[in-house]
Amino acid sequence: MFKKILIANRGEVAVRIIRACKEWGISTVAIHSDVDKESMHVKLADESLCVGSHQPSDSYLNIPSILSAIEVTNSDAVHPGYGFLSENYNFAKILKDNNIKFVGPSPDAVSYTHLTLPTICSV
């Protein structure tokens, strides 16, 4: 079981993940942008860390900042929620290579989905 999960998302999805973690007795870390510092997910999490500015590319999609947040908070798993990094092969692979659990599909499954979905959709 995980001891601490970093939630790499915001809003309602992050709130739901945090509430589920609390039910299981798992500590949570919320990442946030500079403008989301008063958001509900930040208030509900056990810890929070600002990972960048209001632009998603500078915060919720900023893999180096998120990796730093994982290290600083000593998180042993990451839950991406949906959107943002949930289907990012490189992110999932980096986590796997660093023995950090990714709460989601394996990097291979993410890669396979991105290769086959366009083909299936064009049929």
Regions from the language model: what does each represent?
Residues 112-123:
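Single conserved hydrophobic/aromatic residue that forms the stacking wall/gate
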Residues 1-112:
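ATP-binding N-terminal substructure of ATP-dependent carboxylate-amine bond-forming enzymes
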